[in-house]
Amino acid sequence: MKLHLLKSKIHNAIVTSGDLEYEGSITIDSELLEMAQMIPNEKVLVVNNNNGERFETYIIKGDYGSRVIQLNGAAARCALPGDEIIIMTFAVMDEKEAGSHKPMVLIVDRNNNPKRRHRVGEEDELLS
């Protein structure tokens, strides 16, 4: 049996901008991508903490250190600049892999600066 498990997430990110004219996606600072172990073109589930909306899109790599979290295309209608969101990736694995899997969690501040990071069930690594 194959299971879909949380692979990684960026928690409490703040939307910095939106571009309705772009073809789609979410642009994320490449430094945050590295820290959260996410990659360009990876499918993400995004949850808007302000309005409860959930939507799927894919990642575009933003400039390193820019702290950009930009929603593009139709996704730009799902959250406004200043909204707090959670960005999640998932992986498919068998039960044996799932037994030892520990998702990566990156928590950011109101300016999208990394505050701390940890694998679920392990201690935080302070980053700021």
From Swiss-Prot:
GO molecular function, one term: aspartate 1-decarboxylase activity
The reaction(s) this protein catalyses: L-aspartate + H(+) = beta-alanine + CO2
Active site: 25, 58
Primary localization class, coarse: cytoplasm
EC number(s) on file: 4.1.1.11
Cofactors: pyruvate
GO biological-process terms attached to the record: alanine biosynthetic process; pantothenate biosynthetic process
Family assignment from sequence similarity: Belongs to the PanD family.
Described purpose of this protein according to its UniProt entry: Catalyzes the pyruvoyl-dependent decarboxylation of aspartate to produce beta-alanine.
Designated name of the protein: Aspartate 1-decarboxylase
UniProt organism field: Chlorobium limicola (strain DSM 245 / NBRC 103803 / 6330)
Gene assigned in the entry: panD
